[in-house]
Swiss-Prot record:
The keyword Ribonucleoprotein applies. Keywords: Ribonucleoprotein, Ribosomal protein. Belongs to the bacterial ribosomal protein bL28 family. The lineage of its organism: Bacteria, Pseudomonadati, Pseudomonadota, Gammaproteobacteria, Alteromonadales. The gene is rpmB. This is Large ribosomal subunit protein bL28. Gene3D superfamilies: Ribosomal protein L28/L24 (2.30.170.40). The keyword Ribonucleoprotein applies. Signal peptide: none annotated. Residues 1-21 are annotated as: Disordered. GO terms for molecular function: structural constituent of ribosome. One of its GO terms (biological process) is translation. GO terms for cellular component: cytosolic large ribosomal subunit.
Length: 78
């Protein structure tokens, strides 16, 4: 399973760890992804999404029905 948010598209990014001596070693910054089920009232079923916490806030704001419609318009299977 890839580490990509289905709602926002957030992916891992790369950067550096910096020690006290300013030595740089490469590292990855991973998005805060959660597996979550949402109830779709119109379809009378649950949908499982792998979303970031930012994606959860977007769903709280817009509503799951609107977000799922946007995902389907993008061609993503939900």
């Amino acid at each position: 399973m890839s580490r990509v948010c289905q709602v926002t598209g957030k992916k891992p990014m790369v950067g550096n760890n910096r020690s006290h001596a300013k030595n740089a070693t490469r590292r990855r910054f991973l998005p805060n992804l959660q597996n979550h089920r949402f109830w779709l009232e119109t379809e009378k079923r649950f949908v499982k999404l792998r979303i970031s916490t930012k994606g959860m806030r977007i769903i709280d704001k817009k509503g799951i029905e609107v977000v799922v419609a946007e995902l389907r318009a993008r061609g993503e299977k939900v």
